[in-house]
Amino acid sequence: MEILIRSTPADVAVAAADILASYANTSATLGLATGSTPVATYKELIARHERGEVSFAGSRAFLLDEYLGLAPEHEQSYYATIRRDFTSHVDFDDALVKSPEGSAADPVAATAAYDQAIRNAGGIDVQLLGIGANGHIGFNEPSSSLTSRTRVVALHPQTVQDNSRFFDNLEEVPRHALTQGLGTISEARHLLLIATGTNKANAVQAMVEGPLSARCPGSVLQLHPRATVIVDEAAAALLEDREYYLFADQNRLH
């Protein structure tokens, strides 16, 4: 696992955008995440696109997850969110931006179809991830199998509470979602996880330095042959081997 510590959230966004842009310019398949953390990275990519530095015209994208019961046109669906935050502002082909079918009549069949669609596309080249305060990635809550596939899950009460800021009130937040499983996520060729802020420090420490455990779904990154974790100083505050990570970053072979 490669741990990159940057001074500020803005620096994290730039570093993540560097990696994503390098893939986009080779017409790669990108795994995209929603939520508040990736927004700055998407803004950086939009700015680079406007300057002619990156193109997504040859890329396709798969989202990590989607709320159960929300149609793509619902303003809080993750498909609508990723269009609002990113893909509609660059030259992505809308037809090549896919999300799990949250409004499907048969959600279980929809999850299996989503896994198959990723396989049919040749897999994901780079998967952008965030991490929740309880260690979840995607909607893989604590106790999720480390080999799980795309499936329907019940959301942890803390996740419902955290996501209520995007809705008018707590009651409107869906209690279930369709999410790529930890096994599905781990099949991406490169995992890129970003985290900022003191509220993520415990989760980052557990993911990087804690035991491999379903209690911290993010710890599955420990098993991946190419995982990059980019955090700001606040999110890195509890890392015991922080000085080594800084040294390794400064002495990387390019």
Curated annotation (Swiss-Prot):
It holds the Pfam family Glucosamine_iso. The active site is at D65, N134, H136, E141. It catalyses: alpha-D-glucosamine 6-phosphate + H2O = beta-D-fructose 6-phosphate + NH4(+). Keywords: Carbohydrate metabolism, Hydrolase. Signal peptide: none annotated. One of its GO terms (molecular function) is glucosamine-6-phosphate deaminase activity. GO terms for cellular component: cytoplasm. Its EC number is 3.5.99.6. It comes from the Bacteria. Pathway: Amino-sugar metabolism; N-acetylneuraminate degradation; D-fructose 6-phosphate from N-acetylneuraminate: step 5/5. One of its GO terms (biological process) is carbohydrate metabolic process. Catalyzes the reversible isomerization-deamination of glucosamine 6-phosphate (GlcN6P) to form fructose 6-phosphate (Fru6P) and ammonium ion. Belongs to the glucosamine/galactosamine-6-phosphate isomerase family. NagB subfamily. This is Glucosamine-6-phosphate deaminase. It comes from Corynebacterium aurimucosum (strain ATCC 700975 / DSM 44827 / CIP 107346 / CN-1) (Corynebacterium nigricans). The gene is nagB.
